[in-house]
Amino acid sequence: MAKVPVLEDAFLPAQPSPQVSPEAQEECCVQLLGKGLLLYPEERVYLAAEAQPGGARGSAERGEHPELPVGVKSEMHLSNGNFSSEEEDGESHDSKTKAADLHLSQKKTITQMMKDKKKQTQLTLQWLEENYIVCEGVCLPRCILYAHYLDFCRKEKLEPACAATFGKTIRQKFPLLTTRRLGTRGHSKYHYYGIGIKESSAYYHSVYSGKGLTRFSGSKLKNEGGFTRKYSLSSKTGTLLPEFPSAQHLVYQGCISKDKVDTLIMMYKTHCQCILDNAINGNFEEIQHFLLHFWQGMPDHLLPLLENPVIIDIFCVCDSILYKVLTDVLIPATMQEMPESLLADIRNFAKNWEQWVVSSLENLPEALTDKKIPIVRRFVSSLKRQTSFLHLAQIARPALFDQHVVNSMVSDIEKVDLNSIGSQALLTISGSTDTESDIYTEHDSITVFQELKDLLKKNATVEAFIEWLDTVVEQRVIKTSKQNGRSLKKRAQDFLLKWSFFGARVMHNLTLNNASSFGSFHLIRMLLDEYILLAMETQFNNDKEQELQNLLDKYMKNSDASKAAFTASPSSCFLANRNKGSTASSDTVKNESHVETAYLPLSSSHPGGFPSALHPFPAGNTDTMPLTGQMELSQSTGHLMTPPISPAMASRGSVINQGPMAGRPPSVGPVLSAPSHCSTFPESIYPTHPQTNQDFYGTNSNYQTVFRAQPHPPSGLYPHRPEHGRCMAWSEQQLSRDFFSGSCAGSPYNSRPPSSYGPSSHSQDSHSMQFLNTGSFNFLSSTGAASCQGATLPPSSPNGYYGSSINYPESHRLGSMVNQHVSVISSVRSLPPYSDIHDPLNILDDSSRKQTSSFYADTSPSVACRTPVVASSLQTSIPSSSSQCMYGTSNQYPAQETLDSHGANSREMVSSLPPINTVFMGTAAGGT
């Protein structure tokens, strides 16, 4: 009960003293009620306080007047800011209170502050205009840009705004600017996307390492935040090569077809993209096969281009572009830790690359080899040097992070007498005839190693050593050589000589002193030596790159186009909407230009001919005939691949495995003439199976089994054909590029004598049909009558898949192939033989097959290929034992005694790589 009066007394205010001034009471009311609740302007309070700076107000706040009521004073401190409803009012009140304490002598008016802020904003916008530019696809770290702004404010003696305010100022200048969060997990940072630093800006070199001597220059900036994971090639998946020089901008010498050049450059870019994709996937051994298939499988009509000096130089430029992208992909410029297995694979790849290129260029013009090999050697040397440096950096990094090791190295290096070593170095060059004043002296050597000691004392990282070496080489080699016009190579040799000698003498002293850190210092010295060699080689390679650039400028009509082609950076397939109409993901080669096909019913009252682009089908089955559009058509044929067989060239040795037709001389076999014979196919290469749902083009058609779709999707695109073992005649007219003309017969696989053909009772003009099965081959055109014989061609007879390399008339060559392209990201693997998948028990082995007397059980031995019959006969059903003339299937396995021996090993000879010339022959032939 005694505590109650105490509590009451605690809240009882003391008797106000008559000495308290009215101004002090007003100030108390201001803090209690808030300035918004006063009935008089608040300036009156501050004017009174300004008139009496040492009066009661200032004393009350300092607690110098004991007469001030204690209760009111407590409430003043407890209610500070609680009664203010607006943040701006509170900030204004606090600022005015502080200004009053400073006697308001240096306080700026609000108007003056607004003027200064507006002026600073204008200066900032002008600074942004001078140093930055809109650049699509470029990311700039937000922290770097703000650091540049702080440097600008320091130089201009301005008060910098906060990061948020500066961000608003940037968007005033670049309204379309966006932000992205980039970086590894745990170390990601915000970046401005769509803005870049101008080359004329002072900040350009510091960010983009323009003054850096190697790819690793500026890695201190790139490595900000460190790395927690090892480098993986999978992070580069989707990398696309930049654009190669366009044939439209080239200045040709002599009579050269622009279409052929364009085709060749397109072929070579796809070839280079395949090399890049396999390098990213780690399939380095597959790259050798791509090289062989491209160069040894070059079409004959493009071979003369390889002797043209302009084309050879363009190849060199393209090689330089490929090698730069390969280097960026294989070796990270951020000096990220790499797995040992990846380093070993890259070393092995660099070791074998030159030999792979040389072997692939056999039997080709020597001028091409002489120009390509020097570029190859520079690439290999650079790859080896960068791999070695990166490996040493990974080993040296833990040593530099170990404080005990660093202290030991500093202690041991302090015992080395650098002056005595400098004197020895001076003696070694005393007999030199070089009298230039800027020669690298012993003083420079001592200075350099003194800087090295300072870096060790500061616990410098690998990136700091790189930055220091860049400065050393720049100041003592490159800059001096430019000033006096001395050869860079000569200057670099002198520097390396003295650097190596001085380093060897330092290691000699450490050995004599029994330094405990000898191993660690030896590792650091190896790292520094390797980087200096890399910096020198990079400078020499840059000079060679400039020569290629000048060469390209000479051949290009537009110099800007040549510079853009040579300096373009690789992109990513994830940045572009590629393959919008792509088919199944397993497709390796996709048709991209399918012809929209019209279908007309065929009736008995329609005896006329059909246009070449129309496909007849029975009128009675129109309700069940599915009409497919472009997408369905591509899906139905998407599983077919281009046969991976290079043409058999008469002038070349068998450098590569060219499949079953390798080694067939083109001179063997008669020159085909109309009417041409239909080829019979080895039974082991083209096995067939019964099929209940047989269509116009059966899914198990006679093409190589390794390229047959697995599993076989049923195709319902075309109606049934009524003729068993017969095929319709194809027209003699010249067809478009997507059509093939030819006469074929559904002859049995075993040999049978030709039989006479009686005229058909129904006459009808022939029509042509679209050739959809691009995976099939050995189809020959015919300009003769609509009849063909069932004779068997010898195994050595030429096949008509590849153009002019086979000796038959131009009229028998196939038309242009359907436009195709190889998938950019695809790993090519060897496909198992057909029997390993569908016949693991060898049930269908040739020796165990039952010999049949005839391939067509329901037809006579004389099977004719004649003109189509009328619609009434087209609607008849097809027995299960029928065959659709080269496209269809059969449930019987014929005896083929003449080709058993040849077909036994043909499956093993099939190569798994699609030849580049088969993909582009259509475009090349069309451009001739």
From Swiss-Prot:
Function: Transcription factor required to direct islet cell differentiation during endocrine pancreas development. Specifically required for the differentiation of 4 of the 5 islet cell types and for the production of insulin. Not required for pancreatic PP (polypeptide-producing) cells differentiation. Acts downstream of NEUROG3 and regulates the transcription factors involved in beta-cell maturation and function, thereby restricting the expression of the beta-cell differentiation and specification genes, and thus the beta-cell fate choice.
Keyword field contains Coiled coil: no
Extent of Basic and acidic residues compositional bias: 92-101
GO biological process: endocrine pancreas development; glucose homeostasis; pancreatic A cell differentiation; pancreatic D cell differentiation; pancreatic epsilon cell differentiation; positive regulation of DNA-templated transcription; positive regulation of insulin secretion involved in cellular response to glucose stimulus; positive regulation of transcription by RNA polymerase II
GO annotation, cellular component aspect: nucleus
Segments of this protein annotated with the region Disordered: 1-22, 53-102
Primary site of residence: nucleus
Subcellular location: Nucleus
Quaternary organization: Interacts with RFX3.
Gene name tied to this protein: RFX6
The family this protein is said to belong to: Belongs to the RFX family.
UniProt entry keywords in alphabetical sequence: Developmental protein, Differentiation, DNA-binding, Nucleus, Transcription, Transcription regulation
PANTHER family associated with the record: DNA-BINDING PROTEIN RFX6, RFX TRANSCRIPTION FACTOR FAMILY
Native source species: Ailuropoda melanoleuca
DNA-binding region per UniProt: 124-199
One Pfam entry name: BCD_RFX
Keyword Cytoplasm: no
Gene Ontology MF terms: DNA-binding transcription activator activity, RNA polymerase II-specific; RNA polymerase II cis-regulatory region sequence-specific DNA binding; transcription cis-regulatory region binding
The protein's name in its UniProt record: DNA-binding protein RFX6
